[in-house]
Regions:
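A short, well-ordered alpha-helix in the C-terminal region of glycosyltransferases
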Residues: 309, 313, 320-335, 341
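Short hydrophobic beta-strand element within catalytic cores of glycosyltransferases
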Residues: 277-281
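Membrane-proximal helix-turn-helix segments that form the acceptor-binding/catalytic region
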Residues: 108, 113-137, 145
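Nucleotide-activated donor-binding/catalytic signature segment of Leloir-type glycosyltransferases, i.e.
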Residues: 218-240
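Aromatic "clamp/platform" in nucleotide-sugar-dependent glycosyltransferases that forms part
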Residues: 260
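Glycosyltransferase donor-sugar binding loop
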Residues: 205-222
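Conserved acidic donor-binding segment of nucleotide-sugar-dependent glycosyltransferases
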Residues: 293-305, 313-318
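Conserved donor-binding/catalytic core segment of Leloir-type glycosyltransferases
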Residues: 169-188, 194-201, 207
Length: 348
């Protein structure tokens, strides 16, 4: 089959969504199909630009390319999943979040524009009307499935997939650090981790790996660490290679991942593959589908006090933390996450 993967791309930004699309393309090609990523440039401000992008997507005709039929369109992200195609399947990573669960959240921007409500209504109307055009609707996780049902009354099926290089993860003896690999940005809550670190009883050390979309945010985090007097217990690794990520995961005491209502989150699955316990929060969304409290990690309230207590616990109870990590690996294996299963579902 000739297959197009429809997504969006914010120039110069690379995260899990881009990795997801590439993983799907590679898996389709490995299965003998011809697959390509159709990435639409996306700008969400001012809000009327969102409407322009929605219209542009609806006007696209990708039923054939250069005289050859496109057999299937797989839509991943808004508004690219609105592109029409007679044989379209959706695997929704998330909707336009500031029009839904983040509408009145401090992270929202849409709510503060005079025309924000009108644009939000237009987004919801389009989703309600056009998502059901697809012959099948899959969600990236149960969290995304629940949002689709709650906000748009659309049924979908959760479809999990493995993280990149899943077969390369390994485990080694735990060293004296917690590892937090993620883009440096407000939704991932590195600030919360720094505030928690300032409250620990023990000399807990945290290694942050990742770069920021905005260099000034990195400066802000480092300034906060100095203000909280935890700079000596923090390591800023910046962007790291895949090999270094594998090594850091393998040698960590635990993995820290407390994002705000994450859609899915490769970090959790990578930790489980490395036999490491995960410390996350009750409002972290996707990770909660995999982390079992006090069995494969710790689920804390999203406060510095609660998170610091979790840090102290794994620091002081290393054998128990190691056992949770091994249980996490077993849990991952029981989930049967595979690209072959994903492709079978998307191409059925």
């Amino acid at each position: 089959m000739r297959i197009l993967i429809a997504t969006v791309q914010v120039p110069f930004i690379r995260g899990g969504a881009e990795v997801h699309a590439e993983g799907l393309r590679d898996a389709l090609c490995a299965a003998g199909h011809e697959a390509a990523i159709l990435a639409i440039p996306f700008k969400w401000y001012p809000p009327e630009k969102i409407l322009d992008h929605m219209l542009a997507c609806r006007l696209l005709d990708v039923s054939e390319v250069a005289g050859t039929r496109v057999d299937r369109l797989i839509g991943l992200r808004f508004p690219a999943y609105l592109i029409p195609h007679p044989n379209k399947v959706l695997w929704i990573l998330h909707q336009h979040r500031t029009a839904y669960e983040l509408w009145d959240h401090p992270l929202s921007d849409l709510v503060y524009y005079p025309n924000g409500s009108q644009v939000r209504d237009a987004i919801e109307q389009a989703d309600r009307k056009l998502i059901p055009e697809a012959r099948a609707v899959f969600a990236n996780s149960r969290n995304v499935q629940e949002r689709l049902k709650r906000f748009c009354d659309i049924d979908s099926t959760p479809l999990y997939h493995p993280p990149p290089n899943a077969e390369k993860f390994y485990s080694s003896s735990a060293e004296d650090y917690l590892f937090f690999p993620s883009r440096l940005c407000i939704p991932k809550r590195q600030e919360l981790v720094l505030k928690a670190l300032a409250l620990t009883r023990n000399p807990v050390h945290v290694c942050f790996a990742g770069i920021s979309d905005h260099p000034d945010y990195t400066d802000k985090l480092q300034s906060l660490a100095r203000k909280l007097k935890v700079s000596k217990r923090v390591e800023w690794l910046g962007g790291i290679t895949e090999d270094e990520k594998l090594s850091r995961n393998a040698r960590a005491l635990a993995i820290v991942y407390p994002p705000i209502d994450e859609d899915y989150g490769y970090v959790t699955l990578e930790a489980m593959l490395a036999s490491k316990p995960v410390i996350t929060c009750r409002d972290s969304g996707g990770p909660l589908e995999f982390v079992v409290d006090r069995e494969t990690g710790l689920i804390a309230e999203a406060t510095p006090e609660a998170l610091s207590a979790a840090f102290d616990f794994v620091w002081e109870n290393r054998e128990e933390a190691a056992a949770w990590g091994r249980a996490g690996r077993d849990r991952y294996q029981s989930l049967n996450l595979s690209w072959s299963n994903v492709i079978q579902k998307l191409l059925a």
